Regions:
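Structural preference for alpha-helix termini/caps and helix-kink/transition segments
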Residues: 261-444
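Alpha-helical recognition segments enriched in aromatics with Gly/Pro capping
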Residues: 1-24, 41, 112-320
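N-terminal, positively charged nucleic-acid-binding surface of large information/translation enzymes
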Residues: 2-7, 11-97, 433, 437
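N-terminal, positively charged, Ser/Thr/Ala/Gly-biased leader segments
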Residues: 91-127
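Short, polar/flexible loop-turn hinges at active-site or ligand-entry regions and domain interfaces
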Residues: 74-80, 101, 294-298
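Short phosphate-binding/catalytic loops that engage adenosine nucleotides
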Residues: 52, 126, 426
């Protein structure tokens, strides 16, 4: 499978179908997990900036060994564990300015579909039952590891460390589980092979194809999912449908601490829940955007502080009065340059460079309402939006002043006040009942 940059050609003109692997909901997400969520939210936002209609699906894995183990530790049900950490996830990513997905499917909602999917693979000869488990025949899948650029020999070597009991149930050590027989005391569902639950990989294949169809435009996730998760998704999905599963694969880089990957297994992680106690959500999000999504980023106190300083500069730029005239061609040149930067594999680092160039241009005296909204639109691609520090009582006072000016036929002053409020994102509506106002953007 090519790792070269390719022009994006959607399945359907003007529309994008994206599936991004979401969290296994057994704990709070850490900063590394958040990078993936933010990266793909930014990619989605950029497609929308370019006027695409985006169907964005990101799942919750709510059936997993880790959830079962956490339920035992906390003395609650796996369902209660999943509900608890889904709520925590939503709270954390909202603080990071992440938009809700078009749909957040949960595995438990698709159990019948998963069973039918596995049955179909068995009928086609791609899967087999063994002692209540069902496994996928890797040898039958042509170009099985094309995504990860691995050979079957590599996989067989990697499988050598598995237990004899596990290997004994398989035709080949590299075969992977589609369905797992239930263990005593574990949550399970009835199936043609006895009570059990789905394997990890089958879940995303089923949710993606059921919601978005057999072939999607983009499938994304963290770099650690390339193998085996995404590799296995491709194998089982294409075996079932006979079609390409995803036309484009995108993987975000890791967040490192002291140049070592942040992970729960290494114990060097910081949860978003804790990070937000000392770091503003927009600052953390802006920090992520300073590096290309596919490259590692080092999480340091200095890097976060620099992000905070730079974000403050952009906020100060945005909050000045945007009155005056500008050269429309110069404004268009910045917009074109921004698109060129982001079109190159969603290069947020280069996109932000253009935003700062535009900020310096604005601060040199080039500002009006059109510039303000163009600037705000670029920032919103990165999920950066600012609160307008305009108090309701101040707006009302200006409206009263404008009404007096109109009554005195001082239309120049009335127009000036209208323009002043528009630069602050406030639109005036003159009605028979009087003047009302509304915000042009809800900035947060």
């Amino acid at each position: 499978m090519s790792r070269d940059l390719r022009d994006f050609v959607p399945i359907e003109d003007g529309k994008v179908k994206m599936y991004v692997c979401g969290p296994t909901v057994y704990n709070y997400i850490h900063v590394g997990n958040a990078r993936s969520t933010v990266a793909f939210d930014t990619i989605r936002r950029y497609f929308e900036y370019r006027s695409y209609e985006v169907a964005y699906i990101s799942n919750f894995t709510d059936v997993d060994d880790k959830i079962i183990n956490r339920a035992k530790e906390e003395g609650i049900t796996p369902q209660e564990v999943a509900d608890k950490y889904i709520a925590a996830f939503r709270e954390d990513v909202t603080a990071l300015g992440v938009q809700p997905a078009t749909r957040h499917p949960r595995v438990v909602e698709f159990m019948d579909d998963i069973i039918r999917f596995v049955e179909d693979l068995i009928e086609k000869g791609y899967a087999y039952e063994s002692q209540g488990d069902v496994y996928f025949r890797v040898e039958k899948s042509h170009n099985y590891a094309k995504l990860a650029n691995k050979t079957l020999e590599d996989l067989e070597l990697g499988a050598s460390g598995r237990t004899d009991e596990e290997t004994a149930r398989k035709e080949n050590p590299v075969d992977f589980a589609l369905w797992k027989a239930a263990k005593p005391g574990e949550i399970s569902w009835e199936s043609p092979w006895g009570p059990g639950r789905p394997g990890w990989h089958i879940e995303c294949s089923v949710m993606s194809t059921e919601i978005l169809g057999d072939t999607i435009d983009i499938h994304g996730g963290g770099a650690d999912l390339e193998f085996p998760h995404h590799t296995n998704e491709i194998a089982q999905s294409e075996a079932k449908t006979g079609k390409t599963f995803a036309n484009y694969w995108m993987h975000n880089g890791f967040v490192n601490i002291d140049n070592v990957k942040m992970s729960k297994s290494l114990g060097n992680f910081i949860t978003v829940h804790d990070a937000l106690k000392t770091i503003d959500g927009q600052v953390l999000r802006f920090f992520f955007a300073t590096q290309h999504y596919s490259k590692p980023i080092n999480f340091t106190e200095k890097a976060v502080r620099d992000a905070e300083i730079n974000l403050k500069y952009l906020k100060n730029t945005y909050e000045q009065p945007f009155t005056g005239t500008v050269d429309v061609k110069e404004l268009q040149a910045f917009q074109d340059k921004f698109v060129a930067a982001m079109d190159e594999d969603f290069n947020t680092a280069n996109g932000i460079t253009v935003v700062f160039e535009m900020a310096r241009w604005i601060n040199s005296g080039n500002y009006n309402v059109e510039v303000k909204y163009a600037f705000a639109s670029m920032l919103e691609v990165f999920g950066i939006v600012f609160v307008e520090e305009v108090l309701d009582k101040e707006i009302e006072a200006l409206i009263q002043k404008r009404q007096k000016a109109r009554a005195n036929r001082d239309f120049a002053t009335a127009d000036k006040i209208r323009e002043q409020l528009e630069t602050q994102g406030i639109k005036l509506l003159d009605t028979k009942e009087g003047t009302r106002w509304q915000r042009l953007h809800k900035l947060k």
